């Protein structure tokens, strides 16, 4: 599975990139035909502390799974996104 990470207004640190790759590779145990997973990281322009948004797009033949979550940290948003995609 190919993993793509794109960002808007933020530069992810290496541990975050590694966490993203590790979490997304676990999705293959649920969907064995995943072609690509794209992750979009964005810091929303708001005064709210829950301003870290992750949009996860999992491409599988015939359908795409799209999950968008916002939280206080990218790690929190990532965990929620992957958990939702598993369902």
Name each model feature, range by range.
Residues 1-87:
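N-terminal, polar/charged subdomain of small-to-medium soluble alpha/beta proteins
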